[in-house]
Amino acid sequence: MQKRVGVLFAVFFGLLAIAAGRTLYLGVLHSAALRRAANTQQVTIEEVPAPRGTITDRRGTVLAISEPADDISVDPYLVKADPNLTKGLLGAAEELAPLVGSAQATVLTDLNEQSGFVYLAKALPAARAKAVTALNIPGVSETPTMRLVYPRNTLAAQVLGMMGENGGLSGLEYADNTILRGKAGKRRVVSDAHGQPISIADVHREVPGAQLKLTVDANIQQRTEAVLSAVGKVFHPKDATAIVMQPDSGAILAMASWPQLSLDDPPTSKATLEAALENRAVSFNYEPGSTFKVVAVSGALQKGLITPNTEFDIPDQIQVANRTIHDAEEHPEEMLTTGQILAQSSNVGAITIGKLEGENTFNEWVHRFGFGARTGVGLPGEETGQVLKPSEYSGSSMGNLPIGQGELVTPIQMASAYAALANGGILRTPHIVAAVNGHPAKLPRGHRIVSASVAAEVRQMLRGVLAPGGTASEVSVPGYTLAGKTGTASKVDPETGEYSETAYVASFIGFAPASDPKLLCAVIVDEPQDGSIYGGTVAAPAFGQIMDFALPYLGIPPG
């Protein structure tokens, strides 16, 4: 019995010794090997970016869309330490360079970095990322992300805007970033010692961003941009912008800027990029010139001070305080009706009507038409313009303001003001987002600024601008009656503070059909250099070319 107990004790102590020895071996003698084994599996929680919301035009044409991509990174230590990398660093760099879009020398430098993490490429298209993975280079790994793609490249580029690393930089991408970006998900990734994933599991699924449907029509936008490009080639202006709008709703069918911006290949210079991204349809502050004359005329009509047929004795110049203001061309003293004053764009006539109203009444109508305030179009960078208070008027202000000098407006403000006249006197908020996730955008109600009868009288008078003897008489669209107003405004020289004799803004704003307007177009050309400086010969023909396409395209009946 004692012998049997002794055997059991011997066996027990033998097993205990073996366990102690194994512990000593694993914990002390083989700890480095164990650490290497543990390191063969690394667990990380990675963020999975949400697909950004798609932006389409009014007919569903995709203008901006997210697609899967990968950020490609490398652990240079793992690359250099791998004994199986027979191709060497130079060979690895040679294979990687064309896939990640970098020079071979740049990739080689990255692979030689004294760091455990280096980006080789960000937002690499999925197909190219897959090709990188297929190289089986140790330490090279990919992290899922999304990349924003613009299928039409330059189309509505300043409206859409661009993305930065932390969200939208400009345009709608910036203005609606909160709803476009969605909500990122998370995933659990187990990787081997070479950084290659062994298993991937979702922790939280990502939530895609909202889908934006715009009021923009891609075909009208394309036509508008093509016309502005032609203006650029012929007149070589500093820049140009155009807006096409439905006056009854305020829906913007096109908003174009020139020079164009390539969203696929934007400028690398920060200053150049910022200038190219500027949407001058909402940000350009300028003195409107003669397109502003409808403000004084509309106010005087509404107050009952004049009628369309009221006659005025108009010389070719007028003295206001210490200033002498001239009509564009010399002429003998003549009798002009209100309608003829608009059609021939008489400065003296507009000033005469403005003086009938007086400072306070004129200022009231400036504000009624929406000047001095943002329109609420929903695009970043919108300016308010600059409108004087009557207390800020000088003795000569009523010689400047009725003819569009001395106050600043934006193209979108001018388009909205004319849209109110086209829409029976009701001013509506211009808008460019039609729906979010299929739900129609909520829009404020319009409000009346002039009576329907006054709006109709102004529309009728504006037809004379495109009739024989008008300042845009050579512009026509077969089958359609047109109405509108030219503007040629001298810019203030920033060095002298005086009006320049070489720098002008040429503009035209009009609508059709004249008696029942369905479509409005505004064209503003900043500092045309060659050929002409006048709104009637620079901007008005561009208006005609845009409307010549858009009216029949939209199925608007001739009239």
Where are these regions (language model features)?
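Small/polar-residue-rich segments within soluble enzyme cores
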Residues: 29, 73-74, 87-99, 109-209, ...
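Short beta->alpha transition motifs characteristic of CBS
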Residues: 50, 66-77, 254-260
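Beta-lactam-recognizing serine transpeptidase/beta-lactamase-like catalytic domain environment
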Residues: 64, 191-201, 242, 246-290, ...
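Conserved, well-ordered alpha-helix/loop/beta-strand core segments that scaffold catalytic motifs
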Residues: 117, 196-240
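Second-shell loop/turn segments in exported
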Residues: 41-45, 72-86, 93-96, 114-122, ...
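Short, small/polar residue-rich loop motifs at catalytic or cofactor-binding pockets
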Residues: 42, 47-51, 184, 236-240
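Hydrophobic alpha-helical transmembrane signal-anchor segments
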Residues: 1-33
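Short, gly/Ser/Thr-rich active-site loops of penicillin-recognizing serine hydrolases
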Residues: 441-443, 540-559
